[in-house]
UniProtKB/Swiss-Prot annotation:
Gene: queA
Function (record text): Transfers and isomerizes the ribose moiety from AdoMet to the 7-aminomethyl group of 7-deazaguanine (preQ1-tRNA) to give epoxyqueuosine (oQ-tRNA).
HAMAP family assigned to the protein according to its UniProt record, in alphabetical order: QueA
Tagged with keyword Chloroplast: no
Record carries keyword Transferase: yes
One GO-annotated biological process of the protein: queuosine biosynthetic process
Signal peptide bounds: none
Protein name in UniProt: S-adenosylmethionine:tRNA ribosyltransferase-isomerase
Homology family: Belongs to the QueA family.
Keywords in alphabetical order: Cytoplasm, Queuosine biosynthesis, S-adenosyl-L-methionine, Transferase
GO molecular function, one term: S-adenosylmethionine:tRNA ribosyltransferase-isomerase activity
InterPro entries per record: QueA, QueA_dom1, QueA_dom2, QueA_sf
GO CC, alphabetical: cytoplasm
Length: 341
């Protein structure tokens, strides 16, 4: 299957630059895997499509303010760090701009020296392994000095950094938000639970690979980035009980979907687990757990639209995207949502 089969025309004006004032007032396109019709709703209508006994799986990761701006020691040259992955307490894999100034042994400082860093080694795709030096708690310094790592297609400054977090975010570790979850409010979640729908939390720390384009012509040759995930015994039990009872499991976002499918057995059960996954889901994949998906509208030729196509079918997905463009849906991280039942 070719990468360019997932291309489509998207006007720049449809790329949402800011979140809506009310999270759940985004539009919702509803699609049935077994029908051709497309229904246009708002996100707060989502309870109409969930039944008592269904299970909603949310990703409770929290985005780190992972962009650091500092200077190179001795020269004072301006530098930007983007934290990618924690290796141990003080050691991280980071992207550095400009990279040519970040040779092994180079030292940098942030916040007038309250945080320092030294390049230890080179990593894949131009990244560096860096050791940080500081007093106190690293996360508190990051909260003080760091900025949110917004996707490259968002060019406007974010007024409130909490709008790039889900209301249920808990465990810090992501370089990007699980954006399907941005539409939920505490009130909407309460309404969903009152209807008898189980809401289960899993964790997958989203990496920047989410935004990396597929650079190969054939999907079979694409290698996904690895991301860390955790599913507790309690979460696995609720999901397995849902399937056993003949009810549906909905993933909130592609990250929740990939976590579920990574932790599934051939017999269609979820096992409690923690580890790294690089699962790549594209048309032809047989889902073992997932029955439905809540997701945003994604980039052309991205692994995310390929995952949606695996569930909905490629032609149906591209047709839905054409309708979304014609109806002027808002796209990408701060955009509107799609529900597949």
């Amino acid at each position: 299957m070719k990468t360019n089969e997932f291309d489509f025309d998207l006007p720049d004006r449809l790329i949402a630059q800011t979140p809506l004032e009310k999270r759940d007032h985004s539009r919702l396109m509803v699609l049935d895997k077994n029908k051709q019709e497309i229904v246009h709703k708002h996100f707060y209508d989502i309870t109409d499509y969930l039944n008592p006994g269904d299970c909603l799986v949310i990703n409770n990761t929290r985005v780190l303010p992972a962009r650091l701006f500092g200077v190179k020691e001795n020269t004072g040259g301006k530098m930007e760090f983007l934290l990618l992955k924690r290796i141990d307490l003080n050691t991280w894999e980071v992207l550095v701009k400009p990279g040519k100034k970040a040779k092994i042994g180079s030292r940098f400082e942030f916040g007038e020296g309250i945080l320092k860093a030294e390049v230890l080694s080179m990593a894949d795709e131009g990244a560096r392994i860096v050791r940080f030096e500081y007093e106190g708690v690293f996360e508190e310094l990051l909260d003080q000095l760091g900025k949110m790592p917004l996707p490259p297609y968002i060019t406007e400054e974010l007024a409130d950094r909490e709008r790039y977090q889900t209301v249920y975010s808990k465990h810090e570790g992501s370089s990007a938000a699980p954006t399907a979850g941005l539409h939920f409010t505490p009130e909407l979640l309460s309404e969903i639970k009152k209807k008898g729908i189980n809401v289960v939390s899993i964790t997958l720390h989203v990496g920047l690979g989410t935004f990396r384009p597929v650079k190969v012509d054939s999907l079979e040759n694409h290698e996904m980035h690895a991301e860390y995930y955790e599913i507790t015994e309690e979460a696995a039990q609720v999901i397995n009980d849902t399937k056993k009872a003949g009810n549906r499991v909905f993933a909130v976002g592609t990250t929740s979907c990939r976590t579920l499918e990574s932790a599934s057995t051939e017999k269609g059960k979820i096992e409690a687990n923690k580890g790294w996954t690089n699962i790549f889901i594209f048309p032809g994949y047989q889902f073992k757990i997932l029955d439905g998906l809540i997701t945003n509208f994604h980039l052309p030729e991205s692994t995310l639209i390929m995952l949606v196509s695996a569930l909905l079918g490629k032609e149906k997905t591209l047709q839905a995207y054409k309708v979304a463009v014609d109806e002027q849906y808002r796209f990408f991280s701060f955009g509107d949502a799609m529900l597949i039942v």
